[in-house]
Amino acid sequence: MELGLTGLRVMVSAGAAGIGLAIARAFVREGARVSVCDVDAAALAALAQSDASLHAAACDVSQRDEVVHWFEGALAHLGGLDCLINNAGIAGPTGKVDAIDPEAWDRCIAVDLTGPFNCVRLAVPALRASTNASIVNVSSLAGRLGFALRTPYAAAKWGVIGLMRSLAVELGPDNIRVNALLPGIVAGERQHRVLTAKAQARGVSFEDVEKSAFAGTSIKQYVTAEQLADYVVFLASRRAATISGQALSVCGDTNMLS
């Protein structure tokens, strides 16, 4: 399928590894011009070595001054903006709500919810000048379902859905599409860390927690970063011209998180 993304100007937060890197590379393959940010200096350096076409900057999206610096450099490099991918996020603490450190709560909300806001408020003026403008927020299935022992993360990801739906209504008259992607159980190091922490919190084995995680899922296999990237590039294309305000689950039909 020809998506017509040649020359599209894209910014991807947390784009130096994992899902963000898969998204950035998918856009590059489609001929887009891409800027990424990340907090991982080593991953950024490795990315710069492997792909000179990508513009990269160190940035913690919870820090407004760092976001401003990223946007100034990216917009100058790209010459404008057509698509913002709010991908940055952290897993937050795992544990019973009465045992969660309030500072860990604050940090999770700051990165996972305030971070997308910090990026959106700077992106919108540039997106208004685009003829194919879109925003994709990477939320989570935890933004649709309750998630025991992951209260901060779930609260933030529900907030990302609310942000997306409100922006879709507000920015629709400017022809800016806004959608959210809700990944289920994603393969990778981060998911392994989350399941390990949950096993420790419950006093059970990793294998037991992994089995429990898939108990409410019809298709019992991990979602891959590459599958998610395919959805994102489609949503950024003109083939998705009338898709906005949608929370799209990529989860193997998961109906319960545990």
For the regions a language model picked out, list residue spans one by one.
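Short C-terminal tail/terminal secondary-structure segment
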Residues: M1-E2, A91-T94, L145, Q221, ...
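C-terminal helical subdomain
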Residues: A180, V204-I243, V250-G252
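The beta1-alpha1 cofactor-binding region of Rossmann-like NAD(H)/NADP(H)-dependent oxidoreductases
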Residues: A41, A57-H69, P102
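Substrate-binding pocket helix/loop in short-chain dehydrogenase/reductase
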Residues: G95-V97, D101-I109, A213
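Short, small/polar-rich loop/turn modules that mediate ligand/substrate recognition or access, typified
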Residues: G172, R177, I243-G245
